[in-house]
Design a protein with these regions (language model features):
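Short S/T/G/P-rich N-terminal loop/turn motif that feeds into the first structured element of a domain
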Residues: 1-158
């Protein structure tokens, strides 16, 4: 791990870019990311400038439910999307915390813009009621947090 045992190269890089972004190692929290399908399967979410709109829902499993139940529902969700997905770019994933928290998982939705998010959400409200009911049997989520998002760094050679 580069942070726990930094190499001279890492220290030089960190010093060179210290004014770009600072990571508070003490304040970072690890997550395991569950990526259920190819991110580009419903179009390109991220624009050329790295921008995308995101929403995250903090969720807890209902009594007797677990990640196994969620994964089974995600298989059904993928089938739903294949048959009924809207025409706007969309991508999603699940974050499981690797630290003590009151939240069992975060559900993330990513869209090309807030306009396409609105179109996709309207389509979901009209056509996704049965699938939403399956998710509701498994977990309870609070209202989403919305973010203007950007990719900070992507090196395809690493």
């Amino acid at each position: 791990n580069a942070f726990a045992n930094p190499s001279p190269e890492f220290l030089a890089w960190s010093d060179k870019y210290s004014d770009v972004m600072t990571c508070d190692i003490e304040g970072r929290f690890p997550w395991t990311f569950y990526l259920p399908r190819d991110p580009g399967s419903f179009g390109e979410v991220m624009g050329e400038n790295g921008y995308f709109a995101s929403e995250f829902l903090a969720c807890n499993f209902n009594e007797g439910k677990s990640g196994k139940d969620l994964r089974a529902a995600v298989v059904q969700f993928n089938e739903y999307l294949d048959q009924n997905g809207s025409e706007v770019p969309y991508f999603y994933g699940v974050y499981y915390p690797q630290f003590e928290t009151d939240t069992d998982f975060l559900w993330g939705n990513w869209h090309a813009s807030f306009e396409t998010m609105e179109i996709g959400n309207k389509d979901w409200e009209e056509n996704g009621k049965a699938m939403q009911a399956k998710f509701d049997e498994i977990s309870t989520c609070i209202s989403p947090d919305y973010y203007d998002s950007r990719e900070l760094y992507n090196n395809p050679n690493t």
